UniProtKB/Swiss-Prot annotation:
Cross-referenced Gene3D superfamilies: 3.30.1390.10, Single helix bin (1.20.5.710)
UniProt cross-references to HAMAP family, sorted A to Z: Ribosomal_bL12 (MF_00368)
Protein's UniProt name: Large ribosomal subunit protein bL12
Self-association and partners: Homodimer. Part of the ribosomal stalk of the 50S ribosomal subunit. Forms a multimeric L10(L12)X complex, where L10 forms an elongated spine to which 2 to 4 L12 dimers bind in a sequential fashion. Binds GTP-bound translation factors.
Length: 124
């Protein structure tokens, strides 16, 4: 007797009518003592996983400074307090973290200022 693979079983199920599938489920219940309804309820039951919480702290990441770096340097100096040369070096590094662990409102404000200056920004 050839081994029944999952693919063959699924293919056979596709060709069955609803009545035949119900009879198959009844046969499984009788043969193995399995109640398909209990399995469905158990699998759809409440999860012990914690619900996703809304983020309260964000990191502002500058992907790149865009076409013109001078306006971005000015905004970076304003936000970080860096000097001119340090701000220039800062913006040349891709995926640079501008500010870490800041509130959503502050992160969005920083993002808006930098995007207005031409930078590409991502909030993480």
């Amino acid at each position: 007797m050839a081994k029944l693979t999952k693919e063959l079983f699924i293919s056979a199920l596709k060709e069955m009518s609803l009545l035949e599938i119900k009879e198959l489920l009844d046969g499984l219940k009788e043969e193995f003592g399995i109640d398909p309804n209990a399995l469905a309820v158990a699998s759809a039951g409440p999860s012990n996983a914690p619900e996703a919480e809304e983020k309260t702290e964000f990191t502002v990441v500058m992907k790149n400074f865009g076409k013109n770096r001078l306006p971005v340097i000015k905004v970076i100096r304003e936000i970080t307090g860096l000097g001119l040369l340090d701000a220039d070096k800062f913006i040349k590094v891709p995926d640079q973290k501008v500010k870490e662990n800041v509130s959503k409102a502050l992160a969005e404000d920083i993002k808006a200022k930098l995007e207005q200056a031409g930078a590409v920004i991502e909030l993480q």
